[in-house]
Amino acid sequence: MSGFFITATDTEVGKTVVAGALAGVFRELGYNIGVYKPLQSGHVASNPEGDAARLKVLSGVPTKEDEICPYSIEEPLAPRLAMKRAGRAVTLKDIIHHYNERLKEFNSLFVEGAGGLAVPYTEDALVIDFAKELQLPLIVVARPTLGTVNHTVLTIAYAKAHGLTVAGVILSGCKECEMERVQENKVMIEELSGVPVLGLLPFFEGEFTKKEVLESAKEYIMISKLEEFIRNESTVAHTSSN
């Protein structure tokens, strides 16, 4: 298996934009990359305002929204609670099954979780349990502002305590007027966690286009560093299969 698991320090931090943008950039580079977000609350998968639709647009994958996100519900709650209130039972086995189905189409998948790693996810698992099953390197998306050092370092420590590899951090929503503080936060996160901050993605105000997002990702995220992970994972997978 290869790809990345995109998680965050909180909800509404920018995971979907980062996941979609990275997938779109890698697809432009010629990689057969897909996107997968198994559970979504707040919108049904087909809603153009929802994460599944945004992932499809930004990544440029041919996959239908309800295949990108097989389980979605309108109520904006933690996925486990939202599904329970809707009378739907979704297990870890279910979402892994759909993950394997997507791998029949793509060589690698960029998987987006929900909120942070300790979010109640399926009826029998937290987000981190799903990440542990996949064993993909993590990309942690975080806010660039006050409080982010604590939230980010704790997220990384939690991931490492569960045996997961953290490829890097991306600070999302960076404003030019705050860049001095953002840079200070970047340095502190790297010093305290031992994990590199691979990008400072700008704040997108109002409506934005796919082109704007992908160009920003190319300019502000260390794509070459992430590409090394994809190549290394592919090499390991090829070696293991021989």
Curated annotation (Swiss-Prot):
Binding residues for substrate: 41
Catalytic activity entry: (7R,8S)-7,8-diammoniononanoate + CO2 + ATP = (4R,5S)-dethiobiotin + ADP + phosphate + 3 H(+)
Involved pathway(s): Cofactor biosynthesis; biotin biosynthesis; biotin from 7,8-diaminononanoate: step 1/2
Binding site for ATP: 12-17, 51, 112-115
EC number, as in UniProt: 6.3.3.3
Annotated binding of Mg(2+), by residue: 16, 51, 112
Keyword terms: ATP-binding, Biotin biosynthesis, Cytoplasm, Ligase, Magnesium, Metal-binding, Nucleotide-binding
Entry-linked HAMAP family: BioD (MF_00336)
Complex formation: Homodimer.
Family: Belongs to the dethiobiotin synthetase family.
Protein name: ATP-dependent dethiobiotin synthetase BioD
Species assigned in the record: Bacillus thuringiensis (strain Al Hakam)
